[in-house]
Amino acid sequence: MGNVLLVVDMVVGFMVEGHNLYCGDESRSIIPNICSLIEDHQFRGDSVIFICDSHEPNDLEFEMFPVHCLKGTEESLLIPELRSYEGELIPKRRYSGFFETDLDQKLTDISPDLITICGVCTDICVMHT
């Protein structure tokens, strides 16, 4: 039991200037709030799960978007501001954190009372998760 915090796509490829799908300077303004959410959940002993964009070079998503967040590259890593926090990391290949991942099983195992979801690109990956 307990609660779960899902942190979606707070990765270098979206959050650091100079990358193909950088979400812009305004996106960085959410970092302190995300950190506070993580700290609050960890203080209460809740689970924190980081869901991170991580693609293969031939991913179908690249038919719609420029190549980004390739598996094993810096772009697919959590931003430095979040790397010191404990939590499980789930790489994803599509908008939804549930597509071909074990997120559903993890949530079933935890059986949370409440799931809080946060992250960048709320109109795409956060919404689809």
Task: Please tell me what each predicted stretch does.
Residues V126-T129:
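Short Gly/Thr/Asp-enriched flexible loops that form oxyanion-binding sites at enzyme active sites
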